[in-house]
């Protein structure tokens, strides 16, 4: 059963400027494994913006936005085929598990895309729904 959906779109230039103007921008929002991925992609602004939009989309699918946890609690990685995968940690994991009654049925689906100016991400949470947050 679908228990949450979220979408986010961001201007890539805004992310590019945030990286240039705030030396802590990346380390505040992304895990070491995400940063390693960005390095492997030559710190491509489109990739970074896509991951940022993905974190926002997942937080919206959880129904909370970024409340009760940090950006780093939503980790966006890629599998061997390049498909984005979501790993929830700490507060985000607690919220996700609460949605499914701690029955380990939560699955997070994610799609990320971009063009020259914007990055977009769409997330769907699937699992056995157990009620209100």
Curated annotation (Swiss-Prot):
Residues holding Mg(2+): 8, 56
Catalytic activity: apo-[ACP] + CoA = holo-[ACP] + adenosine 3',5'-bisphosphate + H(+)
Cofactor(s) in the UniProt record: Mg(2+)
Pfam families: ACPS (PF01648)
Domain of life per record: Bacteria
GO CC aspect terms: cytoplasm
Top-level EC class: transferase
Catalytic activity, EC: 2.7.8.7
InterPro entries xrefs: 4-PPantetheinyl_Trfase_dom, 4-PPantetheinyl_Trfase_dom_sf, ACPS, Ppantetheine-prot_Trfase_dom
Protein's GO biological process: fatty acid biosynthetic process
Compartment(s): Cytoplasm
GO molecular function, one term: holo-[acyl-carrier-protein] synthase activity
The entry's keywords: Cytoplasm, Fatty acid biosynthesis, Fatty acid metabolism, Lipid biosynthesis, Lipid metabolism, Magnesium, Metal-binding, Transferase
Gene3D superfamilies, A to Z: 4'-phosphopantetheinyl transferase domain
NCBIfam families: acpS (TIGR00516), pantethn_trn (TIGR00556)
Function: Transfers the 4'-phosphopantetheine moiety from coenzyme A to a Ser of acyl-carrier-protein.
Similarity comment text for this entry: Belongs to the P-Pant transferase superfamily. AcpS family.
Designated name of the protein: Holo-[acyl-carrier-protein] synthase
Native species: Clostridium perfringens (strain 13 / Type A)
Organism placement in taxonomy: Bacteria, Bacillati, Bacillota, Clostridia, Eubacteriales
